[in-house]
């Protein structure tokens, strides 16, 4: 049985990428240390109706692609959370998973209104990417009303 003390939750942005997996593990560990819950958020800014309006996709009215995408994403996040919890071990953490449409940075900021900490990954690709944050993490850092942790991608060390 998961113990939950009622403290403000930690919010983590997750999108299935390796970097968001690192952010998820960091957030889970932090939730264990703080004896609080975790809210895993996957935000997306793409829907079948939006794609259809641009002519990219034709979906019959009877086929609810948006619901199927949301459900599949929810299941993928649930698996990632379970794997991360097993990998970390330690105290169980109550986890709420949300898959929400909208601009990722705004969805994360809205989801963190009652949180104590917001955790996001930094995609960092290539030499230039390692020096910059992704657009979502940059927006979140600049507009958040609470502490934000940006978890960097792991960069392999290669001998010179």
Where are these regions (language model features)?
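Structural beta-alpha unit
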Residues: 1-6, 19, 33, 82-118, ...
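Small/aliphatic-rich secondary-structure junction motif
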Residues: 2-60, 111
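Alpha-helical segments flanking ligand/cofactor-binding loops in enzyme cores
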Residues: 25, 29, 109, 129, ...
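Short, solvent-exposed amphipathic alpha-helices that sit
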Residues: 26, 72-83, 107
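A structural preference for short, hydrophobic beta-strand core positions in alpha/beta folds
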Residues: 40, 97-99, 150
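Short secondary-structure boundary segments
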Residues: 42, 122-123, 152-153
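Acidic, proline/glycine-rich short linear motifs
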Residues: 42-75, 156-160
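Glycine-rich, Arg-bearing micro-motifs that act as flexible, cationic patches
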Residues: 117-142, 157-160
